[in-house]
Amino acid sequence: AGVPKEEREERLKRYISMVSLNGFENKYPAQLSGGMRQRAGIARTLAMNPKVILMDEPFSAVDHLTKCTLQEELINIRQAENKTVLFVTHDINEAVFLADRVVLLSPRPSTIQKIYEIPLEQKRGRSDPLLLKIAAEIAKDINSGGQDIPNNYWGNL
């Protein structure tokens, strides 16, 4: 009842290539960078061919440049594979850049506070004015206690 060996190998080859890990197939995890380990995890998940992929803070432990690269790769993979991705993050910028919808949860116990639609194509610029507006709205809703957002907060989009 498993996946035949030939199909398994074909899937692995395809997804290793898709996440740019060609040449690293026989390396141990300790021999890979944090970003490469994240890519390997994405390839492993895709090889299982799930309808929905749950990603809980997957890029939180990598540097900013790697994070941006992985975000772009995730968008490309999501489009190529036509997968639904449920992405958990505490990073507003990441949420509005990756999502077609952002769900703001309340503190424990978590309940849905608000849903924000992102009416843009998935291929979008990080500094798109509409993204900045939605991110500011989310930040305002999170900080509804009147706390101001620093002026340079949005500079790293």
Regions from the PLM with identified roles:
Residues 42:
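Hydrophobic anchor residue at the start of the ABC signature
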Residues 107-137:
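Conserved beta-strand-loop-alpha-helix hinge in the C-terminal portion
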Residues 53-56:
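Catalytic Walker B motif of ABC-type/P-loop ATPase nucleotide-binding domains
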Residues 4-24, 76:
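Conserved ABC ATPase "signature" region
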Residues 27-30, 48:
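Conserved signature/switch motifs of ABC ATPase nucleotide-binding domains
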